[in-house]
């Protein structure tokens, strides 16, 4: 039996190494903006996504855009970059009911990963805002993966949303594979714990300074 690694095996090995390296980096990072940058860039590498957005839950009522990257459009907002042009927060509830029509909100409210092959063919969610933005930018948001950030206390503190997985050989936009979804979920779990710990440390530091 040949022990030679196939291209698939090499990719899986590289992704596992990337996950391990990310886990170490996430646990040691003290700057929350750098932490969010690391989450987005690593998740895009793991899934070969063209774009990614990290949302954070605010007061249990809305989702705040914390960072947004898109390689094709050369967009980098939030994190260590400018927050000026970030979209407004998304309400988790409208008129007392859960905002299940928006993918990111649905992921928070249900705690489940959502994998959509083509947003333009999907009728389960409201993509009118996405389509309007695409038309303005000359882009097509096709495949989409939304992963809730659930920490060690099972609290959902945000959502990692990735768009347009690309075939590494052809560059064509494809659906996110089951393996890509698993890698994103593994990273999201690490990221949620790291973000929770960092926010707690920042809150403790602010409280300490208030007593000085």
Language model regions located:
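Short regulatory alpha-helical segment in sensory/regulatory domains of signaling proteins that mediates
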Residues: 23-28, 39-48, 54-58, 95, ...
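Short, glycine/acidic-rich hinge or "gate" loops at secondary-structure transitions
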Residues: 55-58, 116, 123-125, 200-209
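GAF sensory/regulatory domain recognition
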Residues: 41, 53-98, 121-122, 160
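Regulatory loop-to-helix N-cap segments in sensory/regulatory domains
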Residues: 3-11, 135, 140, 155-157, ...
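Signal-transmission linkers at sensory-effector interfaces
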Residues: 1-38, 44-46, 67-69, 186, ...
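Signal-transducing coupling segments at domain and membrane junctions
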Residues: 100-105, 112-113, 117-143, 166-175
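A short, aliphatic-rich beta-strand micro-motif
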Residues: 142-151, 158
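Interdomain signal-transducing alpha-helices
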Residues: 43, 107, 111, 116, ...
């Amino acid at each position: 039996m040949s022990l030679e690694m196939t291209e698939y095996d090499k990719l899986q090995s590289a992704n596992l190494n990337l996950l391990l390296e990310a886990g170490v980096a996430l646990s040691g990072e003290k700057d929350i903006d750098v932490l969010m940058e690391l989450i987005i860039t690593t998740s895009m590498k793991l899934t070969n996504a063209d774009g990614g957005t990290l949302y954070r839950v605010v007061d249990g009522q809305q989702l705040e855009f914390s960072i947004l990257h898109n390689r094709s459009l050369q967009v980098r907002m939030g994190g260590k970059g400018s927050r000026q042009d970030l979209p407004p927060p998304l309400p988790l509830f409208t008129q007392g009911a859960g905002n299940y029509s928006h993918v990111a909100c649905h992921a928070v409210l249900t705690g489940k990963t959502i994998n959509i092959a083509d947003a333009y063919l999907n009728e389960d969610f409201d993509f009118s805002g996405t389509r309007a933005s695409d038309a303005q930018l000359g882009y097509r948001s096709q495949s989409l993966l939304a992963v809730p950030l659930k920490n060690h206390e099972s609290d959902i503190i945000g959502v990692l949303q990735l768009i347009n997985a690309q075939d590494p050989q052809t560059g064509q936009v494809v659906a996110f594979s089951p393996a890509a979804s698993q890698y994103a979920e593994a990273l999201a779990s690490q990221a949620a714990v790291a973000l929770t710990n960092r926010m707690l440390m920042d809150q403790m530091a602010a409280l300490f300074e208030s007593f000085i």
